[in-house]
Amino acid sequence: MFITIEGMDGSGKTTALQRVKQYLEDLNYKVVMTREPGGLPLSEKIRELILNKDGVGMEPWTEALLFIAARKEHLEKVIKPYLKKGYIVISDRFMDSTTAYQGGARGLGVDYLNELQKNILEGFLPDLTLYFELSFEDAEKRLSARPEEKNRLDEEGRKFKEAVKLAFEELVVKEPNRITVIDASKSPEEVFEETKKVILEKIELWKKEKR
């Protein structure tokens, strides 16, 4: 089973993901957690290339295609092999991030980038995507409290980030069977409980389908 976590930086998705992984492992599920861009050496190098502040002014299509190239490598070398071994794979970001950030905020087209990725990934889609929804103001407050250095996309302005949010919301409407919204404005404990509930329900359906 393949689960992806999406949302603006600062939404708390990574923290919730780590807790869910531990919870599922305590239930004796085999779980691997990964991230995008990244997940293996080549993709991590592409991550550094894209997100480094030296990349300011990068052409939108260059940015989008680098993300997609890293994703294709990640899918074939990490995600699919673990799925074949019976693991639950949870990825911090996947194709919807490129659709939202580059398709929506960079203006390349939400529908166009969504379909392009589906073709490149040969129709491969997550079994479940959780979209952590949070207002721009709350996301910015959380980001400003982080001690680590911000990457190039973290430092984009309000107009860009609002466009990302709108694109994610558009995807939620278009793919309601795959994408579930998590209210990330709640406390970390409430977010974890809601995330856990949605994932456990999906796992039960997945197990029934396998029988």
Curated annotation (Swiss-Prot):
PANTHER family according to UniProt: THYMIDYLATE KINASE (PTHR10344), UMP-CMP KINASE 2, MITOCHONDRIAL (PTHR10344:SF4)
E.C. number(s) listed in UniProt: 2.7.4.9
Enzyme class: transferase
Reaction(s) this enzyme catalyzes, per UniProt: dTMP + ATP = dTDP + ADP
InterPro entries linked: P-loop_NTPase, Thymidylate_kin-like_dom, Thymidylate_kin_CS, Thymidylate_kinase
GO molecular function: ATP binding; dTMP kinase activity
Lineage: Bacteria, Bacillati, Mycoplasmatota, Mollicutes, Entomoplasmatales
Protein family per UniProt: Belongs to the thymidylate kinase family.
Organism of origin: Mesoplasma florum (strain ATCC 33453 / NBRC 100688 / NCTC 11704 / L1) (Acholeplasma florum)
Alphabetical UniProt keywords: ATP-binding, Kinase, Nucleotide biosynthesis, Nucleotide-binding, Transferase
A cellular component annotation (GO) from this entry: cytosol
Keyword Lipoprotein attributed: no
Chain positions recorded as ATP binding sites: 7-14
Keyword Translocase: no
Source species, domain of life: Bacteria
Protein name listed in UniProt: Thymidylate kinase
Function noted in UniProt: Phosphorylation of dTMP to form dTDP in both de novo and salvage pathways of dTTP synthesis.
GO BP terms in the entry: dTDP biosynthetic process; dTTP biosynthetic process; dUDP biosynthetic process
